[in-house]
Each structure stands twice: as C-alpha cells, then as structure tokens.
C-alpha cells in the first residue's frame, strides 16, 4: 500500500475540505485522465485497487501515472473502547481530494480503451469522476 516513508507528526487533525483544486487540475503527463468531481478522501487501498484494475485492462499497452498520494493518517480507536483516553492509533492513510483534481493519467492506448480502463478504475472509487482528454488528442480523434 502507498504511504509516506517518514512523517513529522504521527497524527493529524481532520481539517475541512472546501473549494476546488487549484493544483493538479490539468493533464500533465498523459493524453487521458480521470478527474474527480467532488471532495472527499481516497484511501490507499482504493488507489491500489484502481491502479490494478486499469493495469489489468490495458495489459502492457500504455503507461499510467498516479497523480495523488495518501499522505494523511486516519486514526481509529479499538472496538468496544470507552470514550476519552486520547486519540486513537493511526489506522490507514488517505489522500484528500477536491473537485477538479486529476487522479490518474494514461497514454499509449486508444481513446476507447482508455475510457473503459478509467471506468473500471472509477468503479473502485467512492467519489464521482469524469473522463478527460488532452485537447490535441480530441482533434486528432475527430479528424479520423
């Protein structure tokens, strides 16, 4: 699973998710991408499940980039524990995403194959997503 090698503080406060993503909202590496449309948390397991689903579908056809990393620890107290006695132990890691953030990018495959691979990945995620294409790829596909 994805997680930071070392962190300054083991536990973090929850924080608030407001506004849109102002970084990471454009395609940077590939020709196709999966953009999230609402804010929320994506766990390390969900990221890995999405990555495996895409990789299995395209086999060795193209290249995939992950544009998010789970860097926020989520704590959990043991079951049947009374309230109080401090914050729970770190349980898993999540990536905080806001609307407009590109989660995955892909290149080296046809648009139909990329869209299907992204659909399979989106089924593993808890948030609404949208398939996006680079502008110059759209014009090339339309010209054919």
Curated annotation (Swiss-Prot):
Keywords: Ribonucleoprotein, Ribosomal protein, RNA-binding, rRNA-binding, tRNA-binding. PROSITE patterns: RIBOSOMAL_L16_1 (PS00586), RIBOSOMAL_L16_2 (PS00701). CDD domains: Ribosomal_L16_L10e. GO terms for biological process: translation. InterPro entries: Ribosomal_uL16 (IPR047873), Ribosomal_uL16_bact-type (IPR000114), Ribosomal_uL16_CS (IPR020798), Ribosomal_uL16_dom (IPR016180), Ribosomal_uL16_sf (IPR036920). GO terms for cellular component: cytosolic large ribosomal subunit. It holds the Pfam family Ribosomal_L16. Transmembrane segments: none annotated. SUPFAM superfamilies: Ribosomal protein L16p/L10e. It comes from the Bacteria. GO terms for molecular function: rRNA binding; structural constituent of ribosome; tRNA binding. Part of the 50S ribosomal subunit. Binds 23S rRNA and is also seen to make contacts with the A and possibly P site tRNAs. NCBIfam families: rplP_bact (TIGR01164). Belongs to the universal ribosomal protein uL16 family. This is Large ribosomal subunit protein uL16. It comes from Acidobacterium capsulatum (strain ATCC 51196 / DSM 11244 / BCRC 80197 / JCM 7670 / NBRC 15755 / NCIMB 13165 / 161).
């Amino acid at each position: 699973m994805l997680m930071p090698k070392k962190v300054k503080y083991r536990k973090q406060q929850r924080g608030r998710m407001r506004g849109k993503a102002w970084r990471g909202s454009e395609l940077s590496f590939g020709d196709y991408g999966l953009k999230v449309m609402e804010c929320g948390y994506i766990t390390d397991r969900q990221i890995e499940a999405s990555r495996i689903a895409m990789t299995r579908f395209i086999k060795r056809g193209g290249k995939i980039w992950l544009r998010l990393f789970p860097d926020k620890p989520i704590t959990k107290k043991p079951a049947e524990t009374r309230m109080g006695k401090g914050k729970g132990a770190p349980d898993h890691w999540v990536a905080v995403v806001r609307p407009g953030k590109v989660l995955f990018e892909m290149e080296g495959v046809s648009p139909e194959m990329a869209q299907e691979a992204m659909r399979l990945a989106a089924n593993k995620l808890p948030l609404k997503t949208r398939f996006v294409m680079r502008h110059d790829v759209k014009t090339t596909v339309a010209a054919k």
